[in-house]
Regions:
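Compact, glycine-rich, soluble single-domain proteins
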Residues: 6-7, 13-43, 47-48, 64
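Short, Lys/Arg- and Gly-enriched loop/turn segments at beta-strand edges
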Residues: 66-72
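Short structural boundary motif marking the start of a folded domain
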Residues: 1-5
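Loop/turn positions that initiate beta-strands
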Residues: 56-59
Length: 72
């Protein structure tokens, strides 16, 4: 069974009962490079495997980028 959630402002259908960690794996996103906000609350990375996504939840991904060159 699928549920509807909002991911980065867009409606998506996902499998009912999955955790944040499972959702990230399904999207091929490495947990160590993203911060997840669930219903306007930042979720601690250690809780990704136990936090279940529910119908109507709002999920935001914030990715960390590296690289570049800074000169004075």
């Amino acid at each position: 069974m699928a549920i509807k959630v909002i991911v980065n402002g867009k409606e998506e259908e996902i499998e009912k009962g999955i955790t944040i960690l499972e959702f990230l794996k399904n999207k091929n996103i490495r947990p160590e490079v993203v911060t997840v906000e669930l219903n306007e609350k930042i979720i601690d990375r250690k809780d990704y495997s136990t936090t279940v996504i529910n119908e109507g939840d709002k999920i935001e991904f914030v990715f960390f980028m590296g690289g570049g060159n800074f000169e004075n």
